[in-house]
Amino acid sequence: MKNINPTQTQAWQALEAHFAANKETRLKDLFAQDPKRFDKFSLTFGGDILVDYSKNLITEETLKLLVDLAKETDLRSAIDAMFNGDKINMTEGRSVLHVALRNRSDRPIECDGKDVMPEVNAVLAKMKGFCEKIISGEWKGYTGKAIQHVVNIGIGGSDLGPVMITEALRPYKNHLQMHFVSNVDGTHIAETLKKIDPETTLFLVASKTFTTQETMTNALTARDWFIKIAGDKAHVAKHFAALSTNGKAVAEFGIDTNNMFEFWDWVGGRYSSWSAIGMPIALSVGFENFEALLQGAFEMDMHFATASYEQNVPVLLALIGLWYNNFYGAESEAILPYDQYMHRFPAYFQQGNMESNGKYVDRNGKPVDYQTGPIIWGEPGTNGQHAFYQLIHQGTKLIPCDFLAPAISHNPIGDHHPKLLANFFAQTEALAFGKSKEQVEAEFLAAGKTLEQVKDLVPFKVFEGNRPTNSILFKSLTPKTLGALIAMYEHKIFVQGAIWNIFSFDQWGVELGKQLANKILPELNTDAAVTSHDCSTNGLINTWKAWKA
């Protein structure tokens, strides 16, 4: 990867001039000028995912200049470096090879001169055997009963991905009841333990190091609860498995290391659902469906690695997002899935994007003087329409939105799905084209009102429009399609980080709070007044001490 400040490139200067000349562009005019705009500004991936980016504030010239920026910042070398196993996570000295985890070809992928695929495939085979035993009921608990409940204990990448994917693939789930515990707040584990029977429960402890504070606190609580009822520590081996690389700590916990499923330093937490961290996904929907998830991601990987920038879905989405972030000054992007099964999809990519590209230091170690990662948020439609769409439509902030929806529902009840999709189609049309003063007045006249009667109300019913959106329509939410969609967003994030000249695969921003929490924790175990911090922190701690007494 080359360390190029994007703002110093000729393409960036050209984009600034282009923006200055075209910032008053109206989507209404762009569509009026070109009846074939949809054909020019949409792509189909794999025959079952349509990406319509025509409702964006872009022209063919805009895209040409954005592609020039990708070329001038040498995006190609960054893509090649990732797929070739180069140590592009330089602050931690690691390769970034989540693409290896879903490599469904015979192509070797090397890290430090060694092909990682034999180890990847060995872990997948081990996962498959384990899943088959649990799902079939062959695996028995300490009283001879089959497993009915699976509790995944993890946090961050060891939780958000498995939660999102198991929820999204709920139509494919088997009889196993899945539970997820992440928060160190005792309420999370306590409420989960109320729902399960130790005789029929399998706990998955997901921590690469087996030292993560939140995860190990919850795991120890679960183990203590289990032993108290089961009565023998030896039974832990039949009810706990580890997704980890720390064999010594796993064994000391009481887990049989034969039931430890490893992954590697070149797997980042927020990109780890394709690895052993995906065990709860495989247990929930079966290993064949987990493999279909990998296949979908692999096909998107191949598209990303080989397609021209002009026909490359992740690259185009990244460049369009950069256009709003760095030239229009948009601070956030909304991800709005019109599918209730995808209700955790925005939260998953909130982590994926903000932990990856929430950086203010470039790859040269210098503070940047341009905007990097956006704020990511969203909720499923149509719920969001009755919550925050008001601000998107008529507020003062520009919020580019991605709308996602399946053409075919897993639950075709009555006219529910046509009504859902009517809203999906209507929202991007409304955001793009709005409603003019003249249209509002015409509606009032048609309803029998006079303009004099409604003149004070008219301004409030005007929609400016010109709000940009992408529409991502897919045939059905299958494991394969979901895998492709996740990989699409992963690569979008990578492209933006590469162009912004930042490191997208570390997360030093999570460390300071943890360090301070470790310092504060012993102070909470005494009754003495705390004076070692600033007056605000001291005041908060001392008030807590007084109140808990």
UniProtKB/Swiss-Prot annotation:
InterPro entries per record: G6P_Isomerase (IPR001672), G6P_Isomerase_C (IPR023096), Phosphoglucose_isomerase_CS (IPR018189), SIS_dom_sf (IPR046348), SIS_PGI_1 (IPR035476), SIS_PGI_2 (IPR035482)
Location within or outside the cell: Cytoplasm
Keywords: Cytoplasm, Gluconeogenesis, Glycolysis, Isomerase
Record bears the keyword Iron-sulfur: no
CDD domains to which the protein is assigned, alphabetical: SIS_PGI_1, SIS_PGI_2
Gene Ontology annotations of biological process type: gluconeogenesis; glucose 6-phosphate metabolic process; glycolytic process
Active-site residue numbers: 355, 386, 514
SUPFAM superfamilies named among the record's database cross-references: SIS domain
Catalytic activity: alpha-D-glucose 6-phosphate = beta-D-fructose 6-phosphate
A matching Pfam family: PGI
Pathway: Carbohydrate biosynthesis; gluconeogenesis; Carbohydrate degradation; glycolysis; D-glyceraldehyde 3-phosphate and glycerone phosphate from D-glucose: step 2/4
GO molecular function: carbohydrate derivative binding; glucose-6-phosphate isomerase activity; monosaccharide binding
UniProt similarity note: Belongs to the GPI family.
Protein role: Catalyzes the reversible isomerization of glucose-6-phosphate to fructose-6-phosphate.
HAMAP family: G6P_isomerase
Name recorded for this polypeptide: Glucose-6-phosphate isomerase
Native species: Aeromonas hydrophila subsp. hydrophila (strain ATCC 7966 / DSM 30187 / BCRC 13018 / CCUG 14551 / JCM 1027 / KCTC 2358 / NCIMB 9240 / NCTC 8049)
Gene name of the encoded protein: pgi
